[in-house]
Amino acid sequence: MSQDSFKQYLLSEFNIQFNNETLLLEALTQRNYLNEHPDEPGRDYQRLEFLGDSVMQVSVAEYLFKRYPNWHEGQLTEMRIAMVQTRSFAHFSRVAHLNEGIRLGKGEEMSGARDRDSLLEDIWEAFIGALYLDQGFEAVRKFLDQTLFAAVDTDFFDRFIDFKSRLQEKLQKNGAVDIDYRTENEQQLSHNAQLFEASVSVDDHELARGTGKSIKDAEKAAARAALKLLEEK
């Protein structure tokens, strides 16, 4: 996608129009591109990536603080950690099509860098840093509302939360207990896929069950279900 097309895309999809377009170019520029174009002014994305990391931390913390007024500090911290996992940033770079605007060197382009998670993680933070410098926190929040924050009501961030450790910590708060996970059922699905059902019990009393495409995922789902039951009591 050309830079003009990418700027038009940002405007039509997110209502984002940079006042200082140099910031946008910097956020999308890899070092190898500048090495191959020494006559072009400007920097690569790395300084903006540094800034964007901090902007993400603050934006996510504020979002969670306001959205979940009854959550304690531990719950807020755990969810914040899950939401600012750099592994998730690569996903949201693709969702927002930031990968299509990156300025790459020819060698990096040929090696598939445009779809490389590590680069997309960096570009996400650099874009956030550039948007913050250009338009402030409110513009960043609006962009996140359409991308990262929109995923909060799905199970996307569950992959980054250790529900088994959370359950163990909660159950053993007042002393040692015996926590046992069992595989209760296994189904063979189409295309060689499998579905597992697992249970979690405490001192031989079953708390909850969960399903997943692997035993590990099923146990994690069971732990999550158990936590939900305990938190509702």
From Swiss-Prot:
GO terms for biological process: mRNA processing; regulation of gene expression; rRNA processing; tRNA processing. It is found in: Cytoplasm. Residues 162-232 form the DRBM domain. Its cofactor is Mg(2+). It holds the Pfam family dsrm. The keyword rRNA processing applies. Gene3D superfamilies: 3.30.160.20, Ribonuclease III domain (1.10.1520.10). PROSITE patterns: DS_RBD (PS50137), RNASE_3_1 (PS00517), RNASE_3_2 (PS50142). Homodimer. This is Ribonuclease 3. The gene is rnc.
